[in-house]
């Protein structure tokens, strides 16, 4: 099994989180008191949605476990956030 360093990036608005091909290995979302979502796309704002996380209408922290080798993004990792305070992506 190949091992790589795990890095992190945090965003509070839509945008590119990782500007290269990678694997997303985990996600932490700081939710607000309004239901929302986080969509991670491969290929920019119009790219393919690879991970969608719907968040509850409760302020707090939501950790998303991604098994095995993670989810592969071939181009980049772009985040589209709705009604969340922040999202941290663990990748490598």
Residue ranges and their predicted role:
Residues 1-92:
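Surface-exposed, low-hydrophobicity beta-strand/loop segments enriched in small/polar/acidic residues
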